[in-house]
Amino acid sequence: DLTRDVCCRLLSTVGLCANEYIEREVDGTLSGGEMKRLEIATVLAKPHKLCIFDEPEAGIDLWSFSMLIEQFEKMYKEKKQSLILISHQERIIQMADRIMVIEGGKIASIGQTADILPQLLGKTADSYSCLKCR
């Protein structure tokens, strides 16, 4: 079980005020950004070897997006977690080791970011799966 102190630290890590969220039922009043940050805190509470995030940047503000990138980097570098990030955001794509491009529901290309990224310039695809793997 998580102690109150651990919960406070996790919420603080993702920029949420613990006093607002601990010992209170979350009743649907959270913004999209707050909900994303709460989801990240939940993942941080019990780290896994592999974490998958589908468009983690959706519905969040610029500050939350920066915090999200920082948390992903920490999860990868410090906690040695592999991440699969499904995103169209250039910043998320650039932080990936490998990219898989999906077009028409099929894999169009997959490989190292340095090899695939130049092919993506000026193009759109159904989705990009960005992989940070160990």
Question: What role is predicted for each listed range?
Answer:
Residues 80-94:
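Conserved H-loop
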Residues 43-44:
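ABC ATPase C-loop
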Residues 39-40:
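Hydrophobic anchor residue at the start of the ABC signature
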